[in-house]
Curated annotation (Swiss-Prot):
Organism expressing this protein natively: Caldivirga maquilingensis (strain ATCC 700844 / DSM 13496 / JCM 10307 / IC-167)
Recorded family membership: Belongs to the eukaryotic ribosomal protein eS6 family.
Superkingdom to which the source organism belongs: Archaea
Matches recorded under NCBIfam families: PRK04290.1-2
Name of the molecule in the record: Small ribosomal subunit protein eS6
Amino acid sequence: MPTFKLVLSDPRSGKSKQLEVKDEVAQRLIGLRIGDVFDAQLIKEIIDLPQGFRIKITGGTGYDGAPMHPGIEGPVKKYALLSGRPGFRPEKKGLRVRRLIRGNTISDQIVQVNAVLVYPENWDKEPVIQVSGEAKPTEAKAEEKAEAAQ
């Protein structure tokens, strides 16, 4: 059975959460492509999201470290001539390099899937993914200044 990590990003809070996807839940995601949007209730065993939320797949990585590329169809692995992202960041304009990349379809060879949370249109509450235990940067700086003044 396939197992991979799902990195779920929240665009409103700017935070992300890494989730372990195993067995039956992972099997449901196999065959989806970059850009596909699915109902969050599909992975309700892993993360509890309110009704109406959707998840959009934005990319991923294979077991060999090769990134998924939206321009390559299917669950394949091949060498391609890249001039930019994803998979290559040129240092000079016009630079091209042949790199190993994966296709745009999730398969059992994928170890990490990147995704973004899509909010319902009428959602006006706080962000869903929040990292607890973090102090706000302004509060932390104020505490440091108070300690330094003493």
